[in-house]
Amino acid sequence: SQKSFIYNINAGKLSQDHWVKDPKIGGGRIIGEICHFLDLLVFLTGEKIVNFSISSMDDSLEDCFIITLNFKDGSVACINYFSNGHPKVEKENLKIFTEGKYLEMNNFLKINGYGWKNFSKKTFFYQQKGHKECIHKFLHSVKNGLDSPVELDELIHVSELSIEINNALRK
């Protein structure tokens, strides 16, 4: 089913000499950070991104921008990536709207839901970003000769898209 996403990232300000901003080390904020948000959205939809647009604030090319995404199944997403927010506001907030239902994830610590049978909220004691689970699944697949838990074409799709978005921002 089609989904609508609003993904707010309160990224925080980085100095110009920060390693993330170095194209040779961190790749810049799109290559080094946005790729993860794209990957999550592709995972949640199960679909490839077929179109995007990007807009940035004139004076902060790589620190404050909005990316809109269209997915093959008609789902849409908006990634709001800002470094000009207050540091006490959560870094990541993802809102998902689908079939009269709503989910909201705050900083990978809390999930609230409306319209879901037998679910309304879940709170974690520490951030649950899936790193441990991903490593476990990868090692399990290698050990047992299974396919990769993430399809190669999905990894390539997100990587190529990250480069395309980065190039579009710099035009």
Predicted regions and their residues:
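Short, solvent-exposed polar/charged micro-motifs at secondary-structure junctions
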Residues: 14-18, 60-66, 160-161
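Predominantly a Rossmann-like dinucleotide-binding segment in NAD(P)-dependent oxidoreductases
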Residues: 1-55
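C-terminal helix-rich "cap/oligomerization" subdomain common to oxidoreductases
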Residues: 72, 137-171
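Interdomain hinge/lid region at the active-site interface
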Residues: 112-123, 130-137
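Contiguous beta-strand/loop segments that form the cofactor/metal-binding neighborhood of enzyme cores
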Residues: 32, 38-110, 132-146
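A short glycine-threonine-serine/GTX helix/turn-capping micro-motif
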Residues: 25-32, 120-129
